[in-house]
Amino acid sequence: MNNVYESPLSSRYASKEMLYNFSSDMKFSTWRRLWVSLAKAEMALGLPITQEQVDEMEAHITDIDYDVARQREKEVRHDVMAHVYTFGKVAPKAAGIIHLGATSAYVGDNTDIIQIREGLLLVRKKLATVLDKLAQFADAHKAQPTLGFTHFQPAQLTTVGKRATLWMNELLMDLGEVEYRIENLRMLGSKGTTGTQASFMELFDGDESKVKELEKRIADDFGFAGVVPVSGQTYSRKIDAQTLATLAGIAESASKFATDLRLLQHLKEVEEPFEKNQIGSSAMPYKRNPMRSERICALARYVITDSLNPAFTSATQWFERTLDDSANKRISVPEAFLAVDAILGIMINVVSGLVVYPKVIEAHVMNELPFMATENIMMDAVKRGGNRQELHERIREHSMAAGKRIKEEGLENDMVDRIAGDPMFGMTREQLLEHLDPSAYIGRCPSQVDEFLSECVRPAIAPYLTGEEIKVEINL
């Protein structure tokens, strides 16, 4: 429909997999799976529930009549009870035991945790793919000297590949955070209205071992290591805050990468992919805008800002729970996942097609290298009998003059010619040029790249690169 607002995150940016994870089908079929799990555990622990009732429920996990649910919710003003009713319509023999002993948070919060886990698993896969692509890029360009920048002013040389490891190092931190969140995520379990499990103690005649076993069976059904040890009615909203802080961390790293790439594209040293028929500007046909990187930055700002929502929600929950969390988390949590999913998809696309222009890079290097080489030139001249302090002053004078020529007259750097013509140095132009090999100024860059990839990156991403390669289609 074109007359109803549609979020760009769903219509333009996020993947089908992530969209499904936060879809109504995923949500409400998971509610039904949770009701089945509860009924099976209660039956196994001695409550009067039959296999026939469980079988009937299991046969109707996905055939959700949303019209019936919507109509019922209008009548009772309660989404969970509307879906209990709707489930009971297709599983009439089980209608009387659906949701037995549970409160709304049993299906709502446990489903939220499941969606968070599945979302993090999707993020982890894409994050590992980004790191894999960047590792290939870093390895290919580990020995390509390039200007390093501090304050966005030319500094000492680095290499194109070494710079890529800086992006990767931050993403590797993010991968560790994602892994930690997945590993430590726990279900709410079956805690009852205020977290005391009083309703289940009543059902099981005060048998605490059965109440605890009930939760264990439910957690096992959904592949969790356990349930939260204590809670109010809901799981702590700090879990949402921590999850979105992790997603915001990915957004931070992605924005840093994309910002650097935008600056490199301005310098014409490295460019993001640009398709054959892509139009950069409606008015300036020659333009090649870094729109993918700009989109990464735009979405990253959204995620970083969005991460404040669950933080405020967690900080303002009262006692065992208040409902002012609900409307906010319905928006903030899924949309953070959708945005990060989009960011990582764009990054995979960009990193897979980065274009490096070595000749431009070399020209920029050679324009600055004469200044960088002056310390080595000075030491060589001292070895030939020169006075270090006098040579230092003469280099300062030549540097100022060469810099003025470049900045005010737009001419090339003539620092080498100035020193070659200065008898104080006693060096020919050829001798000076020996000091202008860029590879002599990159330190351990190639080795650092090799070590980082072999010792840190590849072991970390190897478990997640099995199976079909992720293919990303970007909607421009």
Q: Language model features by range: what are they?
A:
Residues 302-388, 394-397:
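Long, amphipathic alpha-helical stalk/connector segments used for oligomerization, subunit docking
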Residues 271, 394-401:
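Active/binding-pocket-proximal capping segment
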Residues 208-233:
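Active-site-adjacent "gating/activation" loops or surface patches in catalytic cores
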Residues 234-269, 278-339:
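A conserved active-site cap/scaffold subdomain adjacent to cofactor or substrate pockets
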Residues 19-23, 68-70, 278-298, 320-335, ...:
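Short beta-alpha connecting loops at secondary-structure transitions
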Residues 139-161, 271-287, 320-327, 352-372:
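Glycine-rich cofactor-pocket loops
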Residues 1-198, 204-217, 280-281, 291-295, ...:
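A helix-coil-helix interface module used to build multimeric assemblies
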Residues 25, 117-128, 135, 161, ...:
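Short amphipathic alpha-helical segments with heptad-repeat character
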